[in-house]
Every structure is written in structure tokens, then in C-alpha cells.
Design a protein with these regions (language model features):
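Hydrophobic membrane-targeting and insertion signals
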Residues: 1-99, 104, 122, 141-148
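Amphipathic alpha-helical binding modules
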Residues: 100-147
């Protein structure tokens, strides 16, 4: 087993698979969302998808190193504590883990040269933490798939 999430998730033969699985995870999360706040998230997702086909996959690939960096402290603590399900571990640390992940997207959105993307992100950022928290068990499962 590699020591860090960077080594695990960013390995040249693994990274494309991680991106593909993360895209599938996002699609599954979108399909299961309902309610008022979900409508805004779905609209932002559709805007990004329609504005530039393949943009979501490109952004997953672009954001992956930052996500690995932000999740690394959780991964290290999970391993040190002898945990068996990283998704459960992330869910228990949902507030902090979701904000760590969102710090990566916040920085990327702020640096975007595409105003429509930045505006779409801005409309959903306020409620994003709860959506990220809901996805943490699946995120952890995705990491575990490649870690072991």
C-alpha cells in the first residue's frame, strides 16, 4: 500500500480510473438529490456540463491533487487509528472534511476565468457543505477501492 493519497490516487495508471469513478459518484449523487437546495445544485451542475462538455471530468482531474492533499490528514489519522471504513471515518468528521474538500473548489472557482462557472459555483456554495457531507461515505469508499 502506498503511504499517501497522492501516491495512491495520482499514480499514472490509477488516476484516469479515479477520475472516471469520481465522475460516476457525482452523477449518482446528483441523481439522488431532491428539494429546493438540490435544484440549485442540479442547475449549477447542468450549467457547467452544458457550457463545456467534458468540463466536469476535466475539473475532477484538475482538482484531484488538491483533494488528495486536503484528505491526506484524515487518511493518515484513519490509518493510525486502525480504521476499517474510510467513508465512515470521513462521515464522523463531516464538518471538517467537507470544508477541507470545499477549500479546493473555493480556490479554483475564485481563480476561474469563466465568469459563468464562478457565478454558478457562488449560487450553490452556501449549501455545498451538506451535499459534500452526504457524499463522504462514497468518497471514502472510492479511496478505499484504490488503497487496498
Amino acid at each position: 500500500m502506498a503511504a499517501t493519497l497522492q501516491e495512491i490516487l495520482l499514480a499514472p495508471d490509477t488516476r484516469p480510473k479515479v477520475v472516471s469513478d469520481a465522475f460516476a459518484l457525482i452523477q449518482q449523487e446528483m441523481a439522488e438529490k431532491s428539494g429546493i437546495s438540490a435544484a440549485a445544485v442540479k442547475l449549477a451542475y447542468k450549467t457547467a456540463s452544458t457550457f463545456a462538455p467534458g468540463h466536469i471530468q476535466h475539473m475532477i482531474n484538475t482538482l484531484l491533487p488538491g483533494m488528495a492533499d486536503q484528505l491526506q490528514p484524515f487518511w493518515a489519522d484513519f490509518n493510525a487509528s486502525g480504521g476499517s471504513a474510510f467513508g465512515d471515518y470521513l462521515a464522523k468528521h463531516g464538518d471538517v472534511a467537507s470544508e477541507a474538500m470545499l477549500s479546493v473548489t473555493d480556490a479554483r472557482a475564485a481563480a476561474s476565468k469563466r465568469p459563468i462557472i464562478y457565478r454558478a459555483y457562488g449560487t450553490v456554495r452556501g449549501g455545498a457543505a451538506k451535499h459534500v457531507q452526504a457524499a463522504l461515505p462514497r468518497v471514502g469508499d472510492l479511496v478505499m477501492k484504490y488503497a487496498y
